[in-house]
Amino acid sequence: MKTRIKLYAVLTAAALLTGCGAFNSSESTETTTENKTTTAASDTTTDCCEDKENDCCKDEPADCCGDSAEAVTIGAPEKTDINIGHLNSTAHLLAFVAAEEGYFKEEGLNVTLTQFSSAAELVNGIESDKLDVAFVGSVPTLTFQSQGHDISIFGGAMTNGHGYVIKSEYADEDELGVEILKGRNVASVKNSVQDAELQILLKNANIGIGEGKDEVNIVYFDSQKDAYAALSNATIDAASVYSPYASLAKSQGYRVVYYCAHEEALQNQPCCRQIAKTSALNSNPNTFTAIERAFIKAYHFTQTDHDKTIKDVKKYIDIENDLIETEVYGGYSVSSPDPDKQGTVTLKDTIVDLGYTDDYDIESYYNTDIYKNALASIIAEGSDDIYKELEEHFNEYE
């Protein structure tokens, strides 16, 4: 899972863009359990140097003296009824698994999941207090932040998972690249990773955007659902996709133009992020730490039980199991809770350079303490290679 952000020129770095859209609606609730306090390290520290002549704070393990960096005490959630908004993506499985495997309940939370069609709808839900948490694409998140909206990133949801598909009469095999889009009408979503990635690849290939025979004509739609549905129109030849549309398209006879995970210029970009009101993160830290603990546990589950993960995802994204397996475990995307701050800050700088949004100070809109404390508390309860890998990644890319 060690995602490494590769920096190329501004053109390549611009691939660090994101966005997502709509499918079928579903929701899930968890029964509230008794509020509890989770302690990452014992509240009372045993003096392991008692009756010894040596200096325990110099010669013994750090936590012997109660100064371990992992000692984090998490209080009971300030709020237990939580509404989480997601898109129609298999990549948002952290919420699905946390609900179905009872991890929200373990954290004393009563959670309702609701599917939305676009980033704008999700952000509106956050700002109107209809949602407490939302999985939103990085680019729209950054754009809304630059406009002064009170939303902050506190975790991750997906890396990669995008591409384009084309009608089979224009391609006899998959992954022929953007050259086959010349002279075609391509459906996409404005201000999304799909759109930005395509524009980067076209520019790198010296292919213009327009209606000429050697150009690519991009036709914009309000959501990924609408862009994909436009393939049924005779005037649209190709369309953007994100998980699970690529697999769905292949099952319906379309060809994949490219997977972003397979394009060197587009690999490992931070995609959808966990967002919440900045003010809510500040006033209810225990609640969001509990939510993050549930997401981290869900990630661990996805790495250890593939079959049950697929069943959990299917309850929210109702497509065939083999398509879910391809999207989740086929190497096209990664669903990790890590906030991936370095990569997202690089993304912000990139889209500013590209004119997607105005520059702004992202520091006050990025909260990594929630994830840091949640992960530390889980590791203190009992760690393994999966949790250690999350810790290593966070320490390297915070």
Protein language model regions, located:
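Secondary-structure end/capping motifs
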Residues: 282-360
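Histidine-centered metal-binding segments
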Residues: 42-68
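Extracellular mucin-like PTS domains
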Residues: 30-45
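Pocket-lining segment of extracytoplasmic ligand-binding domains
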Residues: 138-140, 226-315
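Bacterial lipoprotein signal-peptidase II cleavage site
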Residues: 21-33
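Conserved C-terminal helix/tail region of periplasmic/extracytoplasmic solute-binding proteins
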Residues: 352-398
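Sec-dependent bacterial lipoprotein signal peptides
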Residues: 1-18
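Short, glycine-/small- and polar/acidic-enriched structural segments
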Residues: 66-220, 237-243, 256-260, 267-268, ...
